[in-house]
Amino acid sequence: MASDMTYTLDTCICVKIVQNPNFVNLLKLYIDSENSSVYVNEQVIKEIQRKFGYEINHLLGHLKSSLGVDVFYGNISDKIESDAKYLLKHTSVHNGDAQILAFTRNTDSVLISCDKDLISIAISVGVSTINPDQLHTGNLEFQINKGRDRIAQTVEKISNQVKKPVKKITWELYTA
């Protein structure tokens, strides 16, 4: 975990945190509660209010208490808006995601999102990302790859002719 890290949450992450308290435990492994801060920007709040009806103060309070970090509301400035327009012209990102991505670039923060398309575009424009849907697979892949270093031994199948005939054991009940 790095010190003084800032993160920007996408809409899907905020919704997952509110709807699934266990999801936060996974994120806490990657967010240092002492040296990190989290941004939720204007676009994310608009999407959440439109789709789910969460109030801004309720959402920010819930995120702060769940994650244990400082959570800040970020406005979409004119500079961010012009960067979003640039991203719309030069990438395949849609308007809402363009604003979220432009905000992330402007704040030099790490984007946390479950949106695979947004993540791939963010990586292509040089933004660091975290996809919590793939965090749990890292250790499993490491364990699988670790086993490749061993030399595999070939085992030949034993033919039926080599096997010894076996008597079938039957159990009988004797009563007196």
Where are these regions (language model features)?
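Acidic, PIN/NYN-like endoribonuclease modules and their adjacent C-terminal/linker elements
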Residues: 2, 116-176
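Short coil/turn segments at beta-strand junctions that form active-site/ligand-binding loops
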Residues: 3-6, 36, 107-109, 155-160
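PIN/NYN-family metal-dependent endoribonuclease catalytic core
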Residues: 6-9, 19-57, 64-76
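Active-site neighborhoods of divalent-metal-dependent phosphate/nucleic-acid chemistry enzymes
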Residues: 72-124, 149-152, 156
